């Protein structure tokens, strides 16, 4: 990146690792979002070293809950908000709630 050999970075964050996902992930919401925040902080650090914003792409995928798919979407929105609040130095409030999984589907 610092040598100019990389033009942008893709952050691939899959919701299937979340503890409420039907695939049985083991990462709770707080830790899952800390991953997003750590990426955003790293991107800001690299941007400071470059003297310009590092172009980033957030690739949000996965999430296989059949009982409440909106919780999967809300989890992805939480990740976008966590990253954008850090990268763009903003304070968009996150009021989304992730419902606990009601039963195992698989």
List where the protein language model places each region.
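A general "terminal functional-core" signal
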Residues: 1-106
